[in-house]
From Swiss-Prot:
Name of the protein: Mediator of RNA polymerase II transcription subunit 11
Domain of life: Eukaryota
Sequence ranges of Low complexity compositional bias: 150-175
Role description: Component of the Mediator complex, a coactivator involved in the regulated transcription of nearly all RNA polymerase II-dependent genes. Mediator functions as a bridge to convey information from gene-specific regulatory proteins to the basal RNA polymerase II transcription machinery. Mediator is recruited to promoters by direct interactions with regulatory proteins and serves as a scaffold for the assembly of a functional pre-initiation complex with RNA polymerase II and the general transcription factors.
Chief location bin: nucleus
Acidic residues compositional bias, start-end: 121-143, 184-193
Gene that this sequence comes from: mdt-11
MF-aspect GO terms: transcription coregulator activity
Region (Disordered): 115-193
Coiled coil: 31-68
Family from the record: Belongs to the Mediator complex subunit 11 family.
Length: 193
């Protein structure tokens, strides 16, 4: 069974903490010995006192260094900076990307909604007949003159026909001012007759 590199790093950190705990125990024993020696009526030799003081200082330095290293590691883990085994930064970047993507989708939907008004479905027969003439007219007319296309979804005639060519003229609104004028003139002539 192979150990994962992250597992070995974590086990090393745990072993370092255990070693620090043992050093703290040794430091407490050393301090207890010094206190007992000072409590005795008999004078302690200078060499023994220096040895006890040096071992105590050495243990304090080791414990302090190891605890500082562990605290620094934990502070990096808490703020999300890169460290061994951390997924906080990756998760944060993923969430940020997802929120950016969703905001882009909503902005795009809003733009499309403002640019293209909703269109109703056109009857297949009407669409085929209108497309041949509409494409030429759209190329010739400026954009600001083009009117939105309106269609009727129910194209039936009174005599039961399919509603193809007879209703083609009435199924879409005029696309330019010229076409509007010609349509109005035709309607005016029909009204007079």
């Amino acid at each position: 069974m192979e150990l994962n590199p992250v597992d070995s790093i974590l086990s090393d950190r745990i072993q370092a903490i255990v070693a620090t705990e043992k050093n703290i125990d040794d430091m407490m024993k050393c301090a207890r010995e010094i206190m007992q020696d000072l409590g005795k009526e008999k004078q302690i030799s200078k060499n023994k006192m220096d040895d006890n003081a040096n071992s105590f200082k050495k243990l304090i330095t080791q414990v302090e260094n190891e605890l500082s290293a562990q605290m620094q590691y934990l502070s990096h883990v808490c703020v999300g900076s890169s460290h061994q085994g951390s997924t906080f930064g990756v998760l944060q970047n993923s969430l940020l990307a997802q929120s950016g993507l969703s905001s882009l989708h909503s902005e795009l939907a809003q733009i499309l909604k403002n640019i293209e008004p909703p269109t109703q479905e056109v009857d297949e027969d009407n669409e085929d007949e209108e497309d041949s003439g509409d494409a030429d007219m759209l190329e010739e007319t400026p954009e600001d003159v083009v009117a939105p296309r309106t269609t009727s979804s129910s194209a039936t005639t009174s005599d039961g026909g399919s509603g193809g060519a007879d209703d083609a003229a009435s199924s879409s609104a005029p696309r330019s001012q010229e076409e509007r004028r010609s349509t109005e003139e035709e309607e005016g002539e029909q009204m007079e007759n």
